[in-house]
Design a protein with these regions (language model features):
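Short glycine-rich anion-binding loops that position phosphate/pyrophosphate groups of nucleotides
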Residues: 97-103, 210-213, 254-257, 301-302
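Charged/polar low-complexity intrinsically disordered segments
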Residues: 218-225
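Glycine-rich phosphate/diphosphate-binding loop of Rossmann-like nucleotide-binding domains
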Residues: 40-54, 136-216, 228-253, 257-267, ...
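Phosphate/diphosphate ligand-binding glycine-rich loop within oxidoreductases
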Residues: 61-63, 67-138, 290
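Short beta-strand segments enriched in small/hydrophobic residues
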Residues: 33-41
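Positively charged, low-complexity intrinsically disordered leader regions
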Residues: 1-31
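Rossmann-fold NAD(P)-binding glycine/threonine-rich loop
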Residues: 107-123, 127, 250-321
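Glycine-rich phosphate/diphosphate-binding loops that line cofactor/substrate pockets in enzymes
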Residues: 24-32, 84-89, 153-156
């Protein structure tokens, strides 16, 4: 039987509807959460993201402000601006917009954001709360992915859960959140021997490696230095035959890669003569959906939940500040 496709949009919509009412209730008391996104310079790559952030905030009634600093802002200047926002009572949430210019350490600045205004859950104090299974606020993608699993009402306690990827903002916190739910957790990564043997025993599988995009970007860099660089393997990291039949598969990765490449690594072109780019996960979705019991699509799976958790963090931290 084909897998049930997990509709992240639908689950996220339920969260947003609840938040919309909570914001309405706060406003009735004269209290409005305000989210400030701090951006250094103007990044074309983040324009769409910022626009979507603002739209999402407005849909549930949050105030949203883009605080755009000059391109030549240094780390000290950015830290000072964050400290000012920490002190501003009208600001209840702060986002640090990526990418940051060279010379500015994102970790350093994120550690300056007040834990109660850190709606991305990246302050070390908030990351530490994940250890206690109390991510409020917690890293949005990790929390969103686990909330998506919980929405399925499938057994978690005692199940073998495997997390592919150990990044600080996704893989590690997912593992900790699963441990808090009493799953038996294995975390695997680029240095793990025999990845397939771990994946095969997973009742619950989270995949957050971003392998295909990493391979493609590395190829592009190396090709500039050496045109004879061999074409990369940008096929999905997780193949259908690696899965345990009936596994629940949560694909967290977002890979923006060519639809196909030739033997020299040249991408297929679209009708406009430009590289045909697709968005895919780390799992071979079409084949895996015939093996798994539940599976997330990419896009449309974890992505909407990331946005929903960002807004949930914003509302929840505001409620604490208003209390």
């Amino acid at each position: 039987m084909p897998a049930h496709i997990i509709d992240g949009e639908a689950v996220a919509a339920k969260v947003l509807n609840t938040l919309k009412q909570e914001v309405k209730d706060l406003k009735a008391k004269g209290k409005t959460p305000r989210l400030v996104a701090v951006q250094v310079g103007e990044s074309p790559a983040s324009k769409v993201y910022v626009k979507n952030q603002q739209k999402s905030c407005e849909e549930i009634g949050l105030n949203y402000t883009l605080d755009q600093l000059p391109e030549n802002t240094d780390e000290a200047g950015l830290i000072q601006r964050v400290q000012d926002l920490n002190q501003a009572q009208s600001v209840t949430g702060i986002i640090l917009q990526m990418p940051l210019p060279q010379g500015i350490n994102a970790r350093t600045v994120q550690a300056i954001i007040h834990p109660l205004k850190d709606v991305e859950g990246m302050n070390p104090a908030n990351m530490g709360r994940v250890v206690y299974g109390n991510p409020n606020p917690g890293p949005c993608t990790a929390v969103g992915a686990v909330e998506l699993l919980k929405s399925l009402n499938v057994p978690i306690q005692g199940q073998d859960a495997v997390v592919v990827g150990h990044s600080e903002i996704v893989g590690k916190p997912i593992s900790l959140l699963l441990l808090a739910l009493n799953a038996t957790v294995s975390t695997v990564h680029v240095f793990t021997k025999d990845l397939a043997s771990y994946v095969k025993r997973a009742d619950i599988l989270f995949v957050a490696a971003g392998k295909s995009q990493a391979m493609w970007l590395r190829f592009q860099r190396e090709r500039q230095k050496n045109p004879a660089t061999p074409a990369p393997d940008i096929s999905p990291l997780i193949k259908a035959d690696m899965l345990k039949p009936g596994a629940v598969v949560i694909d967290v990765a977002i890979n923006r890669i060519p639809k196909s490449i030739d033997e020299k690594g040249n991408p297929a072109l679209n009708e406009k003569g430009r590289p045909a780019i697709v968005t895919v996960g780390d799992v071979d979705f079409e084949a895996a959906k015939d093996v798994a019991s539940y599976i997330t699509p990419v896009p449309g799976g974890v992505g909407p939940m990331t946005v929903a958790m960002l807004l949930k963090n914003t509302v929840e931290t505001a409620k604490i500040q208003f209390a």
